[in-house]
């Protein structure tokens, strides 16, 4: 919780560590991804996957999901207490794709959760290695962010579908810890809080008794996490009001929606980490790379360098475009679903196009899809440059608001203007400024109105050549100032359904 004085870096959150110096952080993050790699290699051996099959991203995802399910204690306990037909609570599995006689075939596998836990611990020096599990969750979350739209979820909680850029991490499980909280967008936190308040409105006992006390603690903790994401005093003060409310109700929901809208211009600080599929770490470990000795960072050059040298394959449906599939996975790998397309295109070195123009569906293949017509192709995950990932929202000069296009949450620390339609955003703020938060609301609206779309964010920050690992020569790109920025314009993606 940022508000409690100790700022830990992402990597410390990621590895559950106390304050460490840069070298120790690099080593512990290295140990974490090395453990994922060793686990993946062992699973490929168990499943007798060929080299090609082990590089298939769909197989990687199945293996990742199996280990996440094996360690999901709450769900395991629930499954044992509520046995459902055809679900063995002690087993986990999924589709594994193999190459047979020039065709891809799907094989459903089933493993004891206990066995998976044993393999995972063995790969992680006998520890539970929760940080590695969280890392996999964040990779899945980043993939969902790039693949699906959350319009329905937004509308259900009374928010506007145009706030999609605030929804990073909306599919992360509750158990994703501090590292998970760091990558959640403002909209995601608001949505979780609104759901909680709505339950309280509909269920009289929600805040009462021993359980209610725990609920209340969770509520206040979530409020503090959200407060820590805001960068202006007025937004934080409003969060204090929401947190201290005796019994949260519609007034708090209104305040939260107001705050979410304000975050389109007064953006929150949301962390971005490049989390790669397990097979990528597996390939590196198999080739003899020692992550712990070399050190690793999720926010620097390392993931770019790893992707430069990894060949990953994906199954492709008959009318999908392999280049588009590659873009989807590239964005997921760098947590760039909400980044300005001009910036992503520059870094990647090929044009990154809005989702509405992509001829590709999600990466995962449903069990009822026909395998006969499935092909596979290499994912192009390399980049022309690398850039440092940011956790700031890109607001200019500290506390003052800057422009935020209606759907951008910057991923890379690279100089750009943040084009936005102030009229569109401000239209949502007419009227209601009375009530107990009126002065804060007025202050927030004033800051938003003084924001200028032509202001430059991340002044002087640039991208770096892949040979420049110490980040000595920033190349500051110049972008045209047009409104070219959002991945979600003209969106026709599928909804995310659990």
From Swiss-Prot:
Q: Where is this motif: Unconventional nuclear localization signal?
A: 1-18
Q: Where is this motif: Bipartite nuclear localization signal?
A: 198-216
Q: Name one GO biological process term.
A: symbiont entry into host cell
The name this protein carries in UniProt is: Nucleoprotein
Similarity comment text for this entry: Belongs to the influenza viruses nucleoprotein family.
Primary residence: virion
Its job: Encapsidates the negative strand viral RNA, protecting it from nucleases. The encapsidated genomic RNA is termed the ribonucleoprotein (RNP) and serves as template for transcription and replication. The RNP needs to be localized in the host nucleus to start an infectious cycle, but is too large to diffuse through the nuclear pore complex. NP comprises at least 2 nuclear localization signals that are responsible for the active RNP import into the nucleus through cellular importin alpha/beta pathway.
Q: How is it modified after translation?
A: Late in virus-infected cells, may be cleaved from a 56-kDa protein to a 53-kDa protein by a cellular caspase. This cleavage might be a marker for the onset of apoptosis in infected cells or have a specific function in virus host interaction.
Q: Which GO terms describe its cellular component?
A: helical viral capsid; host cell; host cell nucleus; ribonucleoprotein complex; viral nucleocapsid
Give the residue ranges for region: Disordered.
1-21
Q: Name one GO molecular function term.
A: RNA binding
Q: How does it assemble?
A: Homomultimerizes to form the nucleocapsid. May bind host exportin-1/XPO1. Binds to viral genomic RNA. Protein-RNA contacts are mediated by a combination of electrostatic interactions between positively charged residues and the phosphate backbone and planar interactions between aromatic side chains and bases.
User: Which compartment or compartments is the protein found in?
Assistant: Virion; Host nucleus
The UniProt entry, under InterPro entries, shows: Flu_NP
One Pfam family this chain carries?
Flu_NP
Keywords of the record, alphabetical order, are: Capsid protein, Helical capsid protein, Host nucleus, Host-virus interaction, Ribonucleoprotein, RNA-binding, Viral nucleoprotein, Viral penetration into host nucleus, Virion, Virus entry into host cell
The record's HAMAP family line, in alphabetical order, gives: INFV_NCAP
